[in-house]
């Protein structure tokens, strides 16, 4: 399993899965934007652990999040989700790179800052929607139990 401390910030996995599962049905575009902005705080290792588990066809995934250890039993057909998980992971990495490279607002003019912020929020909304789709399908097929 990948290093848990790499990301440095953790999120409660059960809460993430439940929240994103509901998001597809309940949230407006504006709410999805807010959710997208929270992705910066999400744990990269969680997505990595899921992706690796699906590739290896493991039946369990164990990792830490929110200061707790989780042991997740995967059910059903796992192969279906591999591409979606990889896409989510790639989107997250692209988002992080975008944040670090393009969101240095201190030296920008107000106009440029507004334009960058608008682009950033559109990107967040797209990624938030994508994450909701794959996590919703995973949530229906996993049993989450705290150790």
Specify the residue positions occupied by each region the protein language model found.
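Amphipathic alpha-helical assembly/interaction segments
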Residues: 1-147
């Amino acid at each position: 399993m990948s290093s848990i401390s790499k990301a440095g910030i953790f999120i409660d996995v059960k809460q993430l899965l439940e929240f994103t599962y509901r998001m597809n049905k309940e949230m407006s575009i504006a709410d999805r934007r807010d959710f997208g902005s929270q992705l910066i705080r999400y744990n990269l290792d969680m997505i990595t652990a899921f992706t690796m588990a699906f590739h290896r066809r493991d039946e369990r995934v164990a990792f830490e999040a929110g200061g707790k250890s989780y042991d997740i039993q995967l059910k059903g057909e796992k192969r279906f989700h591999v591409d979606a998980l990889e896409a989510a992971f790639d989107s997250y990495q692209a988002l992080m790179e975008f944040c670090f490279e393009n969101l240095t607002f201190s030296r920008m003019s107000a106009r440029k800052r507004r334009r960058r912020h608008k682009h950033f929020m559109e990107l967040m909304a797209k990624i938030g929607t994508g994450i909701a789709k794959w996590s919703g399908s995973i949530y229906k097929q996993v049993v989450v139990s705290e150790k």
